[in-house]
Amino acid sequence: MKSLDDLDFDNRFARLGDAFSTEVLPDPIAEPRLVVASPAALALLDLPAETSDEALFAELFGGHKLWSEAEPRAMVYSGHQFGSYNPRLGDGRGLLLGEVINQAGEHWDLHLKGAGQTPYSRMGDGRAVLRSSIREFLASEALPALGIPSSRALCVIGSSTPVWREKKESAATLLRLAPSHVRFGHFEYFYYTRQHDQLKQLAAFVQEHHFADCNAAERPYAAMFRQVVERNAELIARWQAYGFCHGVMNTDNMSILGITFDYGPYAFLDDFDANHICNHSDDAGRYSFSNQVPIAHWNLAALAQALTPLVEVDELRASLDLFLPLYQAHYLDLMRRRLGLGVAAENDQALVQELLQRMQGSAVDYSLFFRRLGEETPERALASLRDDFVDREAFDRWAEAYRRRVEEEGGDQESRRRRMHAVNPLYVLRNYLAQQAIEAAEQGDYTEVRLLHQVLSRPFEEQPGMERFTRRPPDWGRHLEISCSS
């Protein structure tokens, strides 16, 4: 077991040089204190789950102290934001402190968000607020517990440093972990600035360290892009199956690894709404829940354009054409499992689509529907769920088709219940739960955010005494407006 002040660094990205990032030291926040830490994320670095030395956490991740081997850098990239190209973005408030190697030989980026101004701050103050830092922390740890690939969050550090957004708030930092922080926007930056040598250098770096199995391919960069498409198809399928809405799918927020990245005004669906918009700045609904699939394809096409100096256009198009069928296959498999169905059948896609159509416009809680569906026999579960639907006759027709489908597969109810409970969470990160934890933390009480994180780390298990975290949102929490302000 390692200690926090004795980590092994190997800063590979920093060695790419000044064309890729700029050396910047963290700007400390005042009176830093540990808000919450993740035992699961600590384990990735071979660190003990217990955060006994909270002062050391606060010093290191509040910007007051650095490891001797750390090389903090602000990365440069660009990207398409709401469909329009922004030629120069970069880490405006975050620093890649370095890369740590764990005992398994895995490299983990240590990225400190809220570390102060950088050359890419674009008139910003370089700070993150406690509110957004808690939201990113909770999501970064909740999604992996659901089986959704994501960057991770080691801890949040609070402070007395004031910052101004819509109102006066307090600054915080978040320590994010990921195998890489390279985004689609990194490739776009070097493509659109015609720095094709650096573009090739970046592609070679990513391929060597993160897509090593492509080395043996006849055309390694083409093989790498195909894998990026495959990973994103599976990622978006998991988002859609579990009702996760990202909110800001700009290309600079898309990880080259196909993991969920850069959390902002995200949301899990409460009542099912295919057209749900979780970002109140998204007036046109570009990043609505139902648009996440075509937008992911659009973003992959933007990445493909940036790779045209390295890969033949026909090969890029062929890989792009795989996205939708791959997504559909992953999504249907996930939804089949959520319905407790173990064997594929011809009409499964129609069964899923009909269910979602019946949910639309009804007061049906998306997550709890599947959990309740597995609690009892299909007949009893369907009867208890019926009243949540507006068109009960249409639901009855779906229910009969589903009941027959379950009957055809056979098996006993207890096996079905266990199978469904293993994939249908009892606890999901609802916005109102996050908001309650944030409001308590803003008053200096971190009990709620720590408890919520603990509950969400085991979303499929019934946890005695935690029933309040399963409840649907109260009226005030049903339509919380979340902005990009952070």
Curated annotation (Swiss-Prot):
Active site residues per record: D252
Catalysed transformations (reactions): L-seryl-[protein] + ATP = 3-O-(5'-adenylyl)-L-seryl-[protein] + diphosphate; L-threonyl-[protein] + ATP = 3-O-(5'-adenylyl)-L-threonyl-[protein] + diphosphate; L-tyrosyl-[protein] + ATP = O-(5'-adenylyl)-L-tyrosyl-[protein] + diphosphate; L-histidyl-[protein] + UTP = N(tele)-(5'-uridylyl)-L-histidyl-[protein] + diphosphate
Listed cofactors: Mg(2+); Mn(2+)
InterPro entries: SelO (IPR003846)
GO molecular function, one term: AMPylase activity
The UniProt record lists the keyword Metal-binding: yes
Pfam families: SelO
Top-level taxon: Bacteria
Main EC class the enzyme belongs to: transferase
Binding-site positions, Mg(2+): N253, D262
Residues binding ATP: G90, G92, R93, K113, D125, G126, R176, R183, D262
E.C. number(s) listed in UniProt: 2.7.7.-, 2.7.7.108
Keywords: ATP-binding, Magnesium, Manganese, Metal-binding, Nucleotide-binding, Nucleotidyltransferase, Transferase
Family, per entry: Belongs to the SELO family.
Annotated NCBIfam families: PRK00029.1, PrtAdtaseSelOPseudom
Function (record text): Nucleotidyltransferase involved in the post-translational modification of proteins. It can catalyze the addition of adenosine monophosphate (AMP) or uridine monophosphate (UMP) to a protein, resulting in modifications known as AMPylation and UMPylation.
This protein's name: Protein nucleotidyltransferase YdiU
Organism: Pseudomonas aeruginosa (strain UCBPP-PA14)
Gene this protein is translated from: ydiU
